[in-house]
Amino acid sequence: MKHILNKDTERQQRLIMLMFKDDKWKSAKYISDTLECNIKTLRQDIEYLTTTYEDILVCEYLKNIGYKFLVKPGHSIQEIFLDWINHSLFFSIITDVFYQKNKDDEDYFYNTYFISETTLKRQVAVINYHLKELGMSLSLSKMSFKVQDEFVARMFFGNREMEKRSIYDWDDSQIENQGYAFQLIELLEDFHQIKLTALQKNMMAYFVLCSVVRSSGEFYLEEDNTIESPLVTDKNCYEVLLSFKNPISCSSYLTSKIQINDTLLFLDTFFIKLKENYTSDLAENMSEELMQRIADKMQTDVSVFDKELLVKDIGYILFVRDKYPYKMSYINHRGYFNSVAIQIKYPIFYQAVMDSFNQLSKDYAWLAHYAPELMNSLFRYWKAQDYGYITKINQVKVFISTTLNENQAKLNQYIFEKAFKNKMNIIGYEYEQTSFNSETTNPLLEEAELVICNHLFYQELDKIIVVDDIIDDAKLYFINQRLDKMRKAKLSV
């Protein structure tokens, strides 16, 4: 990462990853120690991020507690990462060479990015450092890619295109090609008797486009081109592939049967291998074990999951592990942030899933490497009619006690229910308590798992939280942490 982003931006990326790791407040010392920078630099980074991305990011500060990052409504932290990617010389060079924008211009990169020959050489060296494990390199003299495995190269280029933007948000110049990609995918689904998930279909569209671009440049899967796809004679497939247009020249990308056949061979291989994994016993068994472990911990039935969709996602992971066992993302971390969002909003579900990954059979233990991506799948595939269960499971029984009047007790109840939603079940309250009328024999005190009060009359109990008459954000944060800890402790072993 440090080779792709400059030193300051790389540190700012780690700062964002750390701050959104969970919803805990973090002290300046903890953050600076973790990032290995001084507190002055940390404050400068926070100031830079919240100023540069003021429409996206907010930083809150509480004395004696620390900092907390929040994303403004209607925005995503991904927007910052996408901005870095789209302004990165690393990605810009790879993109321009891929689309052959420099094909007829030796000075293209100097004139486009106003860089020196030394800078270009250094950046090419960085690119080759990252591409080496894929069997790829960028020739400095020709500024074109050398590729050992064209299938791997197309997977890389597809992933790179996805990393530059939202999977669903295509560049305006490629919108028509996106439509053609979806048409072709549907034809391939029918031919291979396979149905992709919605997310996989959107991802596949990028692989289709990148394959078309590579075939148009005559970078073929097979040097002799003797193998013919069974779909090359399909009129519909042929016409759709002829429709892909180069947005710069407005001419067709593919102009020959050889080029069309090459792209179809790539897609045939993709679909055949994907179908093998979709229908494999391994994908089925892994899905069943994972779902059963989670269902047991959530104290529910395995039928709450859409098994068919999960099998497809695990099948896709098996395909990727076999055909592209390399880094999928260099800067963007969609799966990570989506997983963190689930952790913050649905901590019990998150913990149940993570514990289940850690307890998988030895042969399946490697699947935990894909936990962030599958966390999102498992959440999406929990059937909608049962979502209420995710939020309400393991509610903590809370009793409120105050020395003030009944109105204050009701106000506290309102504040807690508003702040903690489904995390607690308030079973009752008492008011105007004194050392003379407070009784630990109150049956509700016995039933309660947590007692929140503004006095010490029940200090012999090990389940109290003492608050001030006016409850501040710091105390609400502490109560929230206590609730999450208690709810997680209730998970089935």
Short names for language-model regions:
Residues M1-V493:
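A cross-family "folded-core" feature that marks the main globular domain of proteins
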